[in-house]
Amino acid sequence: MIDPNLLRNNLAEVAEKLKVKRNFMLDTEKLTALEDQRKNLQVTTENLQAERNARSKAIGAAKARGEDIAPLLAEMDDMGNQLTEAKAQLDAVLAEINQIALSIPNLPADEVPLGKDDTENKEILRWGTPRTFDFEVKDHITLGEEANGLDFAAGAKLAGARFAVMKGQIAKMHRALAQFMLDLHTEQHGYLETYVPYLVNHATLYGTGQLPKFGEDLFHTLALQGEQPYALIPTAEVPVTNLVRDVIIDEAKLPIKMTAHTPCFRSEAGSYGRDTRGLIRMHQFDKVEMVQIVDPDKSMEALEELTGHAEKVLQLLNLPYRKVLLCTGDMGFGSCKTYDLEVWVPAQNTYREISSCSNMWDFQARRMQARCKAKGDKKTRLVHTLNGSGLAVGRTLVAVLENYQNADGSITVPEVLRPYMGGLDVIGK
């Protein structure tokens, strides 16, 4: 949620930025009308409350003098009814303003390039050289099925499209990748390993910005009578970031760096027909997520650091990748600046996203009321939150299978994974 003071004091400027940079049309007339109603109702309720307090004292004085206070009590009742009605009207207007505010995307940082979609993202760097093969390249589907490690038919039987079953050495490599990532982030990058629920309530989803705008992208549970509704997490960012919801953090304890390995569940609404085969776009996939809660003056530095941590995974696996700065038209709803890391996928002869690292500024913190305070200070400040994939495990498996394939259909195990696979150096044939 962007700063409501910006909407009150710089509405026209904010609306223009949202239109140009986010292709978001803010209804300024409606918001202005609601804000006028809010001000009037605020004054009305405050005046009624003040008058009610004054009348209450007058009744006490009249009673002490032995006067008949019945007429005064009747007036108090009438004033109480007026106050209740005014408060209800004010609450309704505030709720409507809040709903509009929750639908507004974050404002991009000044250095984010203007653009309409991913074709206008800015490439920052490339690392590694894509391998030249002297044999016909197989895709990860063929490699996995020939190794008896990927079974998409079984996934479809058990659940439907966009599900897979992994077995044997492929399943072991998938697990090894996640363990390697966790060990790297906790032992070298300073993150605290965190285990979180895979089901979360709606307040948690509002906190990180999935609700109310992206409800159709989630898998929702059927709430039993008397129970609150839940949704399966689309990313560990949701529960991990919300650990600081409604918390005032000692600034001396910042940054807080957490990592979690979880399954992620996405309906992939709007992705019909895209990546229908293989592990690239699944309803259920594993990811190692990194989250940082930082001093609001240091979040841009933190974004560079966090992105570097994701890059380190790719570098140690010796997987060629490129780093791109997303343009305004390709950024996520709550981000003010995002880098994507795209890994080389030989069978597609292109780079595919494997990590997205974002600075959310105070957008999520305002929703969550996550604040910090320096020792001796009376005022609190909203923290800044960042998140990034470190990495998507399934897509990393795709990249390893395809980049490390051999002419006989076997796959060489990257050196950094061998300790996690009992010293195994080749899988498959």
From Swiss-Prot:
Share an example GO biological-process annotation for this protein. seryl-tRNA aminoacylation
- Keyword Aminoacyl-tRNA synthetase annotated: yes
Catalysis performed (reactions): tRNA(Ser) + L-serine + ATP = L-seryl-tRNA(Ser) + AMP + diphosphate + H(+); tRNA(Sec) + L-serine + ATP = L-seryl-tRNA(Sec) + AMP + diphosphate + H(+)
UniProt GO MF annotations: ATP binding; serine-tRNA ligase activity
Task: Please name the NCBIfam families in this protein's record.
Answer: serS
Share the domain note from the entry: Consists of two distinct domains, a catalytic core and a N-terminal extension that is involved in tRNA binding.
What is this protein's function? Catalyzes the attachment of serine to tRNA(Ser). Is also able to aminoacylate tRNA(Sec) with serine, to form the misacylated tRNA L-seryl-tRNA(Sec), which will be further converted into selenocysteinyl-tRNA(Sec).
Put simply, this protein is called: Serine--tRNA ligase
Q: Which organism is it from?
A: Haemophilus influenzae (strain PittEE)
UniProt lists the gene as: serS
